[in-house]
Amino acid sequence: VWNHETGEYNKAQMSDKRVQVIDYGVKKSFLNELVELGFEVEVVPASTKSDDIINNFKAGKIGGVVLSSGAGNPNILTDEIAEIKRLIDSNIPILAVGLGHYLLALASGVKVDKIKSIKYGSHPIRGEKTVEICGINGDFKISEDIKNIADVTHIKVFNDSAVALKYKNKNELSSEFSPVSNSSICQEFAQMVK
């Protein structure tokens, strides 16, 4: 949780679950959600090499990685996409949100297109057992081809478009929105992280 006195994040107490968050423009509130989930969180710059993260994973220093939200066109972030491909190949548990959601899809070989008619704001999102209101601010949409490699776990109620995914045969989850700590997405990611 953010500590206003020190200007830093407090580490989760007695946490044996550590994750690195790749910062593409991460929100403090989302980092707080990860800490509330019981993770010790280390934020690393977007320029961090996948080999460093993979070595930390193999050494047992971290149990997973989070690809954060942020601004910009995911299609032009070719260096980041190449690094994420290596993370995918390492089988490290990945949670991707916002911009990270699109980058993970691109790294998995699926096309991401700009939406012609953008609708920002609060949207009802239907999961397996719940309907939640979430803030959607994405200008992009993942191709329907994603269904060949991922299961859709959450959709927008208004238009049935996919907004959260679980990749098949992988330890990878992603969502267009920032999930809260008690959401099924975060709970499943917590189970993946050792």
Regions found by a protein language model. Give the residues of each.
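Cysteine-nucleophile active-site neighborhood
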Residues: 56-57, 62-131, 169, 180-192
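Generic structural signal for residues in well-ordered beta-strands
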Residues: 41-43, 112, 152
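Conserved hydrophobic/aromatic beta-strand scaffold that supports enzyme active sites
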Residues: 122-124, 164, 174
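Short loop/helix-cap segments at secondary-structure boundaries that form the rim of catalytic
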Residues: 32, 53-54, 103-105, 144-149, ...
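RNA-binding accessory domains that recognize and position tRNA/RNA substrates
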Residues: 1-61, 74, 180-194
